[in-house]
Swiss-Prot record:
Domain Carrier per the UniProt entry, residue ranges: 4-88
Keyword annotations from UniProtKB, A to Z: Nodulation, Phosphopantetheine, Phosphoprotein, Plasmid
The keyword Flavoprotein belongs to this UniProt entry's keyword annotation: no
Summary of the function given for this chain in its UniProt record: Proposed to synthesize nod factor fatty acyl chain. Involved in trans-2,trans-4,trans-6,cis-11-octadecatetraenoic acid biosynthesis.
Protein name (database record): Nodulation protein F
Pfam families, per database record: PP-binding
Species this protein is from: Rhizobium leguminosarum bv. trifolii
O-(pantetheine 4'-phosphoryl)serine modified-residue sites: S45
Amino acid sequence: MADQLTVEIIAAIKNLAQSENGGRIPAAIGDITADRQLTSLGIDSLALADVLWDLEQAYGIRIEMNTADAWSNLKNIGDVVEAVRGLIAKEA
């Protein structure tokens, strides 16, 4: 079972994926879980930068990586969740 942070980040990424795909998620994608690859949702490096900005604002954190680093290090939703979780713990 996903924790609250995972649920919130999946929702944010799902919303972004919908906007990147004309307002819908193709049925072929299926369920969106922490294992889901960002590219399978149509999220590219520019869209990832948008979601990282939104997460910084939502959680009061600063993600210290440029878009290229983020793109190479954050391959799936779980990677994003763990990066945010670590930064939240650091801020506490």
